[in-house]
Amino acid sequence: VRFGAPGQEKPGVVDAQGAIRDLSAHVKDITGETLAPASIDKLKRIDPASLPLAPAGVRIGAPVGDVRNFIAVGLNYADHAKEAGMQIPKEPILFNKLANTIVGPNDNVMVPKGSTKLDWELEIAFVVNRRARYVSEADAPGYIAGYAICNDVSERNFQIERSGGQWM
């Protein structure tokens, strides 16, 4: 977990009682590298009760900081393709989102000026902890540091009617 003001989040851990504990004396931030197996092994040795408590009611930030790439897969399940009136693609439709659009669970989402068809989808996010290229399906789990819930927000008028597909 990351907590604090936007742009100033600190790394934390949620203890067994649900309290947020401050990990900043041990790691600078929660990043893909922090979530690598060797780093996780070190963090597991820390007794959460020994860590300072975060202030009560503190803002929860995005789960991971220093995101370099946010890659998404369009029409990633048959029901969504059907709902959108589109064919299931033969190959994955990949697109990116800018890292500065990632916000915490209770943060406001910036709505584009002129938006008329704002849409959202609940997605699962995979946090990758190292460089990956041409990874086999069998090896893919070794690159996944963790999972998060993602609320994918899109402006469908801009995406489909104005540009004809994925856009940036």
Give a label for each model feature:
Residues R68-M168:
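Glycine-enriched loop-and-adjacent helix/strand subsegments that border the catalytic/binding cleft
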